[in-house]
Amino acid sequence: MKYLAKKLAGFVMTMLVVSFLVFAAFAVIPGDPATAMLGTQATPEKLAALREQMGLNEPLLVRFGSWAVNFIQGDFGTSYKYQMAVRSMIAEKIPVTLTLTAMSFLIMVAVSIPVGLFCAHHAGGKVDRIVLIVNQVIMAIPPFFSGILITLLFGLVLHLFTPGGYVSYTTSVTGFLGYLIFPSVAIALPKAAMAIKLLRTSVLSEMKLDYVRTAYSRGNNTKGVLYQHVLRNAIIPVITFLGMARADMVAGSIVIEQVFNIPGLGRILLTSISNRDYPVVQAIIVFIAFIVIFTNFLVDLLYQKMDPRITLD
């Protein structure tokens, strides 16, 4: 249990440090939160009373402690611009972004694993060479540009979806999921291309090791050796990459949400930044950081399960 306890402690400490850095960064940004909430026409007495109420006169560490306790309890603060609870503002946005990134991840895995194995099994063949060329092109295209191309081709030319025709999950779940397919593809494509290349390289490297020759000597064919012996070892670095990609998709979805007019965390984050609505920005950044750190934590645990050289003791 030492390995699990160590990773869990690391997760908590990392989350604590990241939260403090985010809180401290917004604390030192020029501007008065009380003035932002009451406006420049507020009297000095009202401003002073609000500062006292918000605890702005307390030391930074004391303020962070109060904020962290409230955050854990679900109180993310109050929006400067809209004078409403941040929690209620982002509550409906979180499922949108999480669904988008989950679909992107599933598409990435569904494409990269079979294609990577096929290319490794037929290395040097015509299909393998074509996939390698296509991979290089896809990896060179930023996700937002992929989103624009997908919108032009599948939305405006082929009319497979209506650009900007987002359907809320509260209105129609099938319509909601259907609209997210193409944005998910835009996010997944570059990551899938990288995973294909990594898995192909990893499999080919494993195929050169002694235990593979031993497996062949026992009468196994290439397909049997690949799936029964090589894949378990070759996929370990790919799992690490997939975990990192899953975490990166949460941040990468911000731009894609703008391209496809999806009202997720990305839109409200950019709007809040332009409005200097720091409590909203702060809550979203900490939430994204939590998803990234928690994903890496799960990947570490899965890595231990896949690699027998790492023990829980």
Region locations from a protein language model:
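An internal, D/E-rich "acidic patch" concept
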Residues: 57-113
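Transmembrane helix irregularities
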Residues: 29, 138-141, 250
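Alpha-helical transmembrane segments of integral membrane proteins
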Residues: 2, 90-128, 172-313
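Hydrophobic residues within alpha-helical transmembrane segments
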Residues: 5, 9, 13, 17, ...
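Membrane-water interface segments at transmembrane-helix boundaries in multipass membrane proteins
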Residues: 133-197
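Cytoplasmic-entry segments and transmembrane alpha-helices of multi-pass inner-membrane transporters
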Residues: 1-10, 114-150, 238
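Hydrophobic alpha-helical segments of integral membrane proteins
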Residues: 8, 46, 50, 60-76, ...
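Hydrophobic alpha-helical transmembrane segments of membrane transport/permease proteins
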Residues: 15-65, 158-179
